[in-house]
Swiss-Prot record:
The active site is at 172 (proton donor), 361 (nucleophile). It holds the Pfam family Glyco_hydro_1. PANTHER family: 6-PHOSPHO-BETA-GLUCOSIDASE ASCB-RELATED, GLYCOSYL HYDROLASE. Catalyzes the hydrolysis of phosphorylated beta-glucosides into glucose-6-phosphate (G-6-P) and aglycone. It has a high affinity for phosphorylated aromatic beta-glucosides (p-nitrophenyl-beta-glucoside, phenyl beta-glucoside, arbutin and phosphorylated salicin), and a low affinity for phosphorylated beta-methyl-glucoside. It catalyses: 6-phospho-beta-D-glucosyl-(1->4)-D-glucose + H2O = D-glucose 6-phosphate + D-glucose. It is an enzyme of class 3 (hydrolase). It comes from Escherichia coli (strain K12). One of its GO terms (cellular component) is cytosol. One of its GO terms (biological process) is carbohydrate catabolic process. This is 6-phospho-beta-glucosidase BglB. One of its GO terms (molecular function) is hydrolase activity, hydrolyzing O-glycosyl compounds. InterPro entries: Glyco_hydro_1, Glyco_hydro_1_AS, Glyco_hydro_1_N_CS, Glycoside_hydrolase_SF.
Length: 470
């Protein structure tokens, strides 16, 4: 195995609503995430006076970021993916003037990263938006939100033009099909036509952000971000193959629009077959032509699909509701572990788009135990990440242009799906439990030293292959 390229970016990925805390500090407004105390897979509910949402404090990154950045630098990070809390900059979402205290926080954060030699990769909207835009406008169902997002994007592009050169528009933009409130600010029971119209507005907003970035920051690069939910046919029946193709198109459609600049023909048919009419203006079509510079995505699992709906209805284990693959093992949360699938996905996306790729989320959520001596022996995490990185290396050998790899949750954080601390991803243990109890003390896990060695050797310390099929 060859070393990873010298230009390859190594690091980790976080999200503001899962690490920052300080949910109303320094003028921050209420975000949609603040109304999801049980996570993406829970229900939206009003704030209950005196009842704390675990994300209100999260891991207190807002106040402890210097300590955390120092730990990331100790591992050798060259890149850290973070998100800006939109409601920290525009508390209601529709203000003309931004909240200076919110802007100043990210100035301090980016300065700290620069001193540590870590490049920021910044997501504009990661599973949240100002709740004011939902309450007063109806979320992304309202075309007016496009303008408010563009104003926000232009504001942060201008403010951080000398500090940030890598941007992403919307985190896992295709998740709106599975979690409409999280993705586009719509009620979970919203109809399919309403969801796709809101998605259209978000795609236009993404393209406008790309256009603004290219205009204001000609040296910067801006990408999209997809949930990489690769689907296999359950059997070799042609009907299952066709069903898998259609399921993969459901999420790749977002990338097709963002990378190719127009709606693909298969979606036109989908809309016709489902009696969906997308209200699209001529200016929308022109805006969509502003395509992303690179494709970024998350990768956690694969699954199977069948043409037999009775089999599909019994799918379990995650928000994507894919049928378990009998040849794969699963995590404690039912997420199937498929390192080879990452190589397949990388090649699939490269063949489809011929644009640089960036793996901006990948990791293993697991329950960690603190030993009597205070150590955390997370060999299972090391095995998971080792085998996925081996496949990334194989994809590079295949000729795929890969910019970098940021593992999800380099430090334990509040999980998105169920707002749990017990579902841990990090190389760094944070002393906090699901009830919000704990000192928030940071402790290096065994995987901390392992990842540092991987980065130092540019992958030459990786070993083939430790996870085997049952």
């Amino acid at each position: 195995m060859k070393a990873f390229p010298e230009t390859f970016l190594w690091g980790g990925a976080t999200a503001a609503n899962q690490v920052e805390g300080a949910w109303q500090e320094d003028g921050k407004g209420i975000s949609t995430s603040d109304l999801q105390p049980h996570g993406v897979m829970g229900k939206m509910e009003p704030r209950i006076l005196g009842k704390e949402n675990i994300k209100d404090v999260a891991i207190d990154f807002y106040h402890r970021y210097p300590e955390d950045i120092a730990l990331f630098a100790e591992m050798g990070f060259t890149c850290l993916r973070i998100s800006i809390a939109w409601a920290r900059i525009f508390p209601q979402g529709d203000e003309v003037e931004p909240n200076e205290a919110g802007l100043a926080f990210y100035d301090r954060l980016f300065d700290e990263m620069a001193q540590a030699g870590i490049k920021p990769l910044v997501t504009l909207s990661h599973y949240e938006m100002p709740y004011g835009l939902v309450k007063n406008y109806g979320g992304w169902a309202n075309r007016a939100v496009i303008d408010h997002f563009e104003h926000y994007a232009r504001t942060v592009f201008t403010r951080y033009q000398h500090k940030v050169a890598l941007w992403l528009t919307f985190n896992e933009i295709n998740m709106s099909l599975h979690a409409p409130f999280t993705g586009v600010g719509l009620a979970e029971e919203s109809g399919e036509a309403e969801v796709y119209q809101a998605i259209h507005h978000q795609l236009v907003a993404s393209a406008r952000a790309v256009k603004a970035c290219h205009s204001l920051l000609p040296e910067a690069k801006i990408g999209n971000m997809l949930l990489g939910g690769l689907v296999y046919p359950l059997t070799c029946q042609p009907q299952d193959m066709l069903q898998a193709m259609e399921e993969n198109r459901r999420w790749m459609f977002f990338g097709d629009v963002q990378a190719r600049g127009q709606y693909p023909g298969y979606m036109q048919r989908f809309f016709r077959d489902h009696n969906i009419t997308i209200e699209m203006t001529e200016s929308d079509a022109e805006d969509l032509k502003h395509t992303v510079d690179f494709i970024s995505f998350s990768y956690y699992m694969t699954g199977c699909v069948s043409h037999d709906e009775s089999i599909n209805k019994n799918a379990q284990g995650n928000i994507l509701n894919m049928i378990p693959n009998p040849h794969l093992k699963s995590s404690e949360w039912g997420w199937q572990i498929d390192p080879v699938g990452l190589r397949v996905l990388l090649n699939t996306l490269w063949d489809r788009y011929q644009k640089p790729l960036f793996i901006v989320e990948n990791g293993l959520g697991a329950k960690d135990s603190v030993e009597a001596d205070g150590s955390i022996q997370d060999d299972y995490r090391i095995a998971y990440l080792n085998d996925h990185l081996v496949q990334v290396n194989e994809a590079i050998a295949d000729g795929v242009d890969i910019m970098g790899y940021t593992s999800w949750g380099p430090i334990d954080l509040v999980s998105a799906s169920h707002s749990q601390m017990s579902k841990r991803y990090g190389f760094i243990y944070v002393d906090r439990d699901d009830n919000g109890e704990g000192s928030l003390t940071r402790t290096r896990k065994k995987s901390f030293g392992w990842y540092a060695e991987v980065i130092k050797t540019r992958g030459l310390s990786l070993k083939k292959i430790t996870i085997k099929a049952p």
